[in-house]
């Protein structure tokens, strides 16, 4: 694995929050000048490759992967599925985690699920079921996510207080995140369905 590959991997997992040079230095042990040089090289590589949809954006010493403007129409069609289309298993899983644990960051969601959740979160944001509620006051200023009014309407809830009570202890086992998350999601879906049938 090359040094640039390591930086590219960090950019990917950092998602929309991005990553600072200091954070890359901490994760890799590379010197800051070398990191800046490799970020420039990677950005140039993306820009020069007509078959790559990626680019690197930098703001206030924070770097993040983004997609080139040319692919925007395709991404728009992918993300803006009509609300009449049922949510995927991954979307329901992320939505349930946000609903019960909000506000929380993408990294916290990733830790609970055991997989990268960036694209799923963005799809939920574009469908207006999830929104940015603030940012943590720590390096990188990670985005905090919460549910929207449309989320309540979508699931037929009057407020977050109407969410069915479930055992959140299943989410506390960091060593086995996926099975516990599955149980959590199943409880979320089953109890919502049961409450609808009782109405």
UniProtKB/Swiss-Prot annotation:
InterPro entries: ScpB_csome_segregation, WH-like_DNA-bd_sf, WH_DNA-bd_sf
Protein keywords: Cell cycle, Cell division, Chromosome partition, Cytoplasm
GO cellular component: cytoplasm
Pfam families attached to this UniProt entry: SMC_ScpB
SUPFAM superfamilies noted in UniProt: Winged helix' DNA-binding domain (SSF46785)
HAMAP family, A to Z: ScpB
Gene that encodes the chain: scpB
UniProt xrefs under NCBIfam families: SMC-Scp complex subunit ScpB
Gene source species: Lactiplantibacillus plantarum (strain ATCC BAA-793 / NCIMB 8826 / WCFS1)
Subunit structure: Homodimer. Homodimerization may be required to stabilize the binding of ScpA to the Smc head domains. Component of a cohesin-like complex composed of ScpA, ScpB and the Smc homodimer, in which ScpA and ScpB bind to the head domain of Smc. The presence of the three proteins is required for the association of the complex with DNA.
Cellular compartments annotated: Cytoplasm
Family under the similarity heading: Belongs to the ScpB family.
Task of the protein: Participates in chromosomal partition during cell division. May act via the formation of a condensin-like complex containing Smc and ScpA that pull DNA away from mid-cell into both cell halves.
BP terms from Gene Ontology: cell division; chromosome separation; DNA replication
Name the UniProt record assigns to this protein: Segregation and condensation protein B
Superkingdom field: Bacteria
